């Protein structure tokens, strides 16, 4: 593997990847937008229908609205994690065709630069697109909300959404970082749906391990929490990332092309 890295070549490959994949990115953006609009409308309609009952039970308007915004943000964040997995699964999907693989190999850049360009497009760039999709969907929900209910109105959920975004670090970012590094040379051996399923299962397994880790440390500390377990957790994630990269360099030879044109 040629490990030479040029930022100039990388920039050209990154621009080429963005231009070449704009339709796929637009499709993912549109799917995220529709999903977020649906989640917000369904959540707030349900809260609006139960509004009178909650007020009757002496629950304040502020508490009802805050709870609705929190639940809506958590729901959208969960779907964002799901959409990130879908985007990662389709990052190298087109390499299952001969012409697509040849076109990528003919680019005047190293394999590392080509991979990093795809990683940047389908992880941080796609994440930003999803966040923008949520913000646009939230504005649209505010505009069209009077059509669904005039009894109670809900403010923007954007601040609450950014408040719960910290969970995305555990759910997706670390997972994608070392999963993609370890699996990118094998992506063309799987259908995108199969890859997505494996990543989705891995995401929930990683989340389960995270919950167990913090629960066990909380029980052991019993009130003497110092925050060191968070540091240990992220150090472990970094070690796993480098281990996956080592495996990626250790086993570089895989079948590249299928028989499809």
Residue ranges and their predicted role:
Residues 1-102, 111-261:
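Hydrophobic alpha-helical transmembrane segments of membrane proteins
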């Amino acid at each position: 593997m040629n490990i030479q890295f040029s930022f100039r070549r990388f920039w050209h490959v990154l621009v080429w990847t963005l231009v070449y994949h704009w339709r796929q990115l637009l499709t993912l953006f549109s799917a995220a937008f529709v999903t977020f609009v649906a989640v917000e409308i369904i959540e707030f309609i349900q809260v609006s229908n139960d509004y009178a009952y909650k007020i009757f039970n002496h629950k304040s308007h502020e508490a009802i609205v805050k709870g609705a915004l929190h639940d809506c943000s958590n729901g959208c964040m969960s779907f964002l994690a799901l959409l990130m997995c879908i985007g990662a699964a389709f990052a190298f999907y087109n390499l299952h065709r001969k012409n697509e693989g040849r076109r990528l190999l003919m680019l005047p850049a190293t394999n590392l630069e080509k991979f990093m360009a795809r990683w940047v497009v389908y992880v941080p760039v796609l994440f930003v697109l999803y966040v923008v999709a949520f913000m646009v969907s939230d504005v649209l929900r505010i505009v069209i909300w009077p059509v669904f209910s005039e009894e109670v109105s809900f403010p923007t959920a954007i601040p609450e959404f950014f408040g719960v975004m910290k969970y995305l670090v555990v759910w997706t970012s670390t997972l994608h970082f070392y999963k993609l590094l370890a699996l990118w040379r094998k992506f063309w051996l799987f259908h995108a749906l199969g890859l997505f399923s494996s990543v989705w299962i891995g995401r929930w397994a990683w989340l389960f391990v995270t919950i167990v880790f913090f629960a066990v440390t909380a029980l052991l500390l019993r009130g003497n929490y110092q925050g060191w377990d968070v540091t240990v957790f992220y150090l472990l994630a970094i070690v796993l990332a480098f281990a996956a990269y080592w495996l990626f360099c250790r086993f570089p030879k895989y079948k590249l092309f299928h028989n499809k044109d």
